[in-house]
Amino acid sequence: SGGFAMRPDIRNNERVVIDAPALAADLYARVARAVPPTLADPRAVGANERFRCYRYRPGQHFARHYDGYFERDSGERSLLTLMVYLNEGFEGGSTVFHDLGVVVTPRAGHALLFQHHLLHEGATVHSGTKYALRSDVMYSAR
């Protein structure tokens, strides 16, 4: 993925990147009511078609981090992370926002929206396998 190198001290999960514009449109239609229509100046225009598919096996995690943004050639830029939890049947693997004191327990089919600048982590999976799909909400160029 274009010079991207995972640091095992930060994350040791597995990841596949796919581009799926039709899936992005369908996903956005399902979550649009929960998306802030504007953040400062720009307005929401849809979901990012670049999906990151994550698999976490026992012992795998994603340490505290901020999510990076995605920018299109048009100047549209992601401001929100859109995480969809794909399964249950594992222990651990919560999404933790330490500064906010919030712990999100993954539930199959549920989505989590949050601003990229919020420090968070994917806690260690203790048993079973966790699957999640990450996209972003794209906003118009400023």
Where do the model's predicted regions map?
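Fe(II)/2-oxoglutarate oxygenase catalytic core
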Residues: S1-A111, H117-R142
